[in-house]
């Protein structure tokens, strides 16, 4: 039977999803949780709705965590002991990969043969585990990097730490071993081929999605009331981890420039910064708070803890514009979520953001991180109601092109393709 013939009959029963450094159960914006967590949880739930069981393996960070937790019907999150029962910095995790891999293999060993049909690893640490599990189980490995060290180092933010050589080598190994490589945009596909020598025929582009039922337009007045923001305020917002890569300082510096241009704006300006620094999730973003004081805008800046559920929706709905000033983004889920709520986005023209934001239609793309350029873009949207109204309509329309259902359908096609190719190759070798 040909590989195409196998593909028609193939449907995965159970997928092993590897997410070593962060759990889909964690609140995005805390610790190292972000868009990847949302991606894993949303696609896992959609897979389960299609009859595919999903088991997510992640490192246990507390002795109180049960061995397994049901995220949704058909989706199980397995906590694998590897190192101390506490959050670790990502730089400390490579030394725990042996223990983590052992836990993953031990879990499979207690099941019937052929329990998992495919492995999908997320981030390079998980790819290292997936590579070994792939060879042990005899199933294909699909890998999503989410971020790439060589790309991050080329766009390093001031004060940020370069990714180590060990990560670069680890990524190169995973790229060479994976059966399929899933990327968010064609730009990322080109980066994998050009910078990591990935085989072009192994790379597949699948755009992430957005929960269009949860993130949708609603009452701005109600959202502002819930946040304690005046109904007539000019509201700028940022949501995400507080780290140099995400560049929330760009928003604060641009805000200070706006106030210098028009001192009267201070009376009605509110800047919402929702998120926390990477780490334990308990810290406040002290350096960013100090910057607000230094810039003289601490009176208009409100620092909120990482927001989830309706609280995050309220932040998006309350804002006149959401800023995504990152130095690099493989895609930018925050931009999609905000636009789905009908809020225009001003974003940096980097990475996958030109796909997530339709320039001059759903928001504006800024080609630099220059303070005055950002102040101009923010003012154009936030201070001009006629511009904001047009972009708001375009924002929702643009976001509707993306859904987790569509993302999951594309992933399933890749899974079936990888399984067919893997089994076909095995058949040829056997013959």
Swiss-Prot record:
Signal peptide: none annotated. UDP-N-acetyl-alpha-D-glucosamine binds at residues 27-28, 35, 241, 246, 307, 329, 337. Its EC number is 2.4.1.250. Keywords: Glycosyltransferase, Magnesium, Metal-binding, Transferase. NCBIfam families: mycothiol_MshA. PANTHER family: SULFOQUINOVOSYL TRANSFERASE SQD2 (PTHR45947:SF3). Homodimer. Belongs to the glycosyltransferase group 1 family. MshA subfamily. This is D-inositol 3-phosphate glycosyltransferase. It comes from Saccharomonospora viridis (strain ATCC 15386 / DSM 43017 / JCM 3036 / CCUG 5913 / NBRC 12207 / NCIMB 9602 / P101). The lineage of its organism: Bacteria, Bacillati, Actinomycetota, Actinomycetes, Pseudonocardiales. The gene is mshA.
